[in-house]
Amino acid sequence: MKLAVIGGDGIGPEVTDEALKVLRALRADIETTDLDLGARRYLRNGELLTDEDLALLREHDAILLGAIGAPGSVPPGVLERGLLLKLRFALDHHVNLRPSKLYEGVESPLKNPGEIDFVVVREGTEGAYTGNGGAIRVGTPHETANETSVNTRYGAERVIRYAFELAQSRRRHLTLVHKTNVLVHGGGLWQRTVDEVAREYPEVTVDYNHIDAATIYLVTDPSRFDVIVTDNLFGDILTDEAGAISGGIGLAASGNIDATGTNPSMFEPVHGSAPDIMGKGIADPTAAILSAAMMLRHLGDEANAVRIEEAVARDVAGRDPEAPISTTEVGDRIAAAVVA
């Protein structure tokens, strides 16, 4: 298994090291290539993501990312557009996959959360994030700006099909989230596509929520959800809310996936680079380790993905919430548990 590793910035390299520790406990065939991408490189030489970097990434089976960002050192949007979004579009990561699970021993901010175990399938290469827009008369009283949301049948359908396949392997329930009563063109395309694809999956029940209703249900009744499929912007909102109700983004993993397998998919913890705790050895690597499990599942190694997830569940359940986290100790415990 050839892995490209982007440790990135802040605590990124620390948590990625622990994810690799767990992977190597299970697999002896892992070959890694470290790539220097992120704020440190940008501040050093102004480079973000070159054609050579992309060519090297394409030689690998998957990409493991730590964290990107240097708040206060790099202007907002530079790393997001020049590195992260460029990676997503260049490698056609059209599926953003975000599981949300409340583990035993983890406190939710919800008073009575019930069972939280669902997945958000977010379209990753279209919608409002394509950069299709502009502004005129900037800085004047007549300034006008627009951001065009681009939705194609091709782009929506491939993500919707991925979501149906996922739902079929889980509890067989899919929820489309959009705003079809106002966004009648883009929303209509999504609704029609879901309705048509649903005929091929008669075992999967389907319902629909407006985005505003979905944000309410995530707080009042999260157990109603199994697989949520939605567009880029709404998915961005829902996935952060989903992380918050299930114990925080410190436990949240994600995948940026080319479902065709043409390009390597990328897996990462949701949390940021947290430069304030960099080098202190107190960053929680759990999300990075769960990202590694997602990667194994994507590559067809279901058995080892389950081993990691079960080891994480036991480890989280046994933690003292008042005790400080040790990055390497968490990695050591989970690496030992997956082979016990």
Swiss-Prot record:
GO CC annotation, single: cytoplasm
Reaction(s) catalysed (UniProt annotation): (2R,3S)-3-isopropylmalate + NAD(+) = 4-methyl-2-oxopentanoate + CO2 + NADH
Keywords: Amino-acid biosynthesis, Branched-chain amino acid biosynthesis, Cytoplasm, Leucine biosynthesis, Magnesium, Manganese, Metal-binding, NAD, Oxidoreductase
Biological or metabolic pathway of the protein: Amino-acid biosynthesis; L-leucine biosynthesis; L-leucine from 3-methyl-2-oxobutanoate: step 3/4
Enzyme class at the top of the EC tree: oxidoreductase
Protein name: 3-isopropylmalate dehydrogenase
Cofactor binding, per record: Binds 1 Mg(2+) or Mn(2+) ion per subunit.
Site features described as Important for catalysis, chain residue numbers: 129, 179
Subunit structure, as described in the record: Homodimer.
Cross-referenced PANTHER family: D-MALATE DEHYDROGENASE [DECARBOXYLATING]
Subcellular location: Cytoplasm
Principal localisation: cytoplasm
Residues at which Mg(2+) binds: 212, 236, 240
Keyword set includes 4Fe-4S: no
Amino acids binding substrate: 88, 98, 122, 212
Family under the similarity heading: Belongs to the isocitrate and isopropylmalate dehydrogenases family. LeuB type 2 subfamily.
One family name in Pfam for this protein: Iso_dh
Residues that bind NAD(+): 272-284
